[in-house]
Amino acid sequence: MSRSSDLFHKAQTIIPGGVNSPVRAFKGVGGEPVFFKSGKGAYLTDVDDKQYIDYVGSWGPLILGHCHPKVIEAVDNVLHSGMSFGAPTELEIQLAEKIASLMPSIEKIRMVNSGTEATMTAIRLARGFTNKNKFIKFNGCYHGHSDSLLVKAGSGLLTLGIPSTPGIPKSITEHTLTADFNNLEQVAQLFEKYPNDIATVILEPVPGNMGFILPKIEFLKGLRELCDQYNALLIFDEVMTGFRVGLHGAQGLFGIKPDITTLGKIIGGGMPVGALGGKREIMSFLAPEGPVYQAGTLSGNPLAMAAGLATLKEIEKINFFEDLSNTTNKLTEALADAAENANIPFFAASLGGMFGFCFTDKNSVENYFDVASSDEVLFKKFFHAMLAQGVYFAPSMYEAGFVSSMHGDLEIQKTYDAAELVLNQLSA
């Protein structure tokens, strides 16, 4: 028995399910999770000293790879001055200014501790600002685990095979309206039905928690127009896409300005963090400036601020995203070539340093149902066989993958060689 297996069995006696976030338990692929002890660059090493090419990247934050020297140096400098003060620091201002200079829609920003806190606060703020209660989310889009947003959510809920979760009264979710991603007509119908009651529309502009889905530009433009028409706010949940698909986020790539943007992951450089930002008049509704309350003991933690600032300074460098996009494209092309050589139906797509794939004969994947109809059994076999070859993909077909600036031609070639071997075996 491996040390990973020993640790998982031990963890199950003291931690629910043996993990502190459900997707880590490998429920989506079967088997037992791998326990890791270190990471460097594009690689992870498990507790049994096996090395893997890492395409999870801590679920997105590690765009510079593991233990980037600039991030380590920044955190180390702050660490010896104090890990937390529960009071304002200059680093908070510096990171806020950096984010606002890069994100087109952000004029003011509030730091929080997680993506869940960011989206939860964004919904509360939108309701407070508009004095309306209902909001629209999209089937399969995941916005953290706050009560009102765990309705037809993606990510871990899809991995576990449940549409929502017990413990949330209907009275909390009665104001949550849902539509299919990329379906503007459904959204228009909801606005027509509740013309004076919808406070906001929230979405991942590029969903990464129901597989990897690229939006139709007409869909995003239509949402902006509908929100303007009905005096509702548009929230882009860019916790995953922010500084991942491009230097100015998905909003910069598609030229759509939301009213509120939520961020996380990369802006903490691997440390726990979240944020929400937007128009000055909206953000000024947050306490202590306005009446909408939000607070957090560790919000603006100096270690997270330092790591995030160091990360953003690196990704600002010339050609960073051009190089990252090229590497990610090479990866998806390599996987597609390996599948084609094995005569296995396969679809892959990418944007910036974010990608996804599934085993399907569809030429495009536009929503949750397209991903759900793909071959999950084959995905599970592929995942475990690639893991055995030292390639670590997300342990769920509903999760996007991530490439870092430390991935290069060597890692892509190794991944291709492994995929060709595995897919030929699976097609035999």
Curated annotation (Swiss-Prot):
Its EC number is 5.4.3.8. It catalyses: (S)-4-amino-5-oxopentanoate = 5-aminolevulinate. Keywords: Cytoplasm, Isomerase, Porphyrin biosynthesis, Pyridoxal phosphate. Its cofactor is pyridoxal 5'-phosphate. One of its GO terms (cellular component) is cytoplasm. It holds the Pfam family Aminotran_3. PROSITE patterns: AA_TRANSFER_CLASS_3. It is found in: Cytoplasm. The keyword Disulfide bond does not apply. GO terms for molecular function: glutamate-1-semialdehyde 2,1-aminomutase activity; pyridoxal phosphate binding; transaminase activity. It is an enzyme of class 5 (isomerase). The modification N6-(pyridoxal phosphate)lysine is found at residue 265. One of its GO terms (biological process) is protoporphyrinogen IX biosynthetic process. The keyword Acetylation does not apply. Pathway: Porphyrin-containing compound metabolism; protoporphyrin-IX biosynthesis; 5-aminolevulinate from L-glutamyl-tRNA(Glu): step 2/2. Homodimer. PANTHER family: GLUTAMATE-1-SEMIALDEHYDE 2,1-AMINOMUTASE, GLUTAMATE-1-SEMIALDEHYDE 2,1-AMINOMUTASE 1, CHLOROPLASTIC-RELATED. NCBIfam families: hemL, PRK00062.1. This is Glutamate-1-semialdehyde 2,1-aminomutase. It comes from Legionella pneumophila (strain Paris).
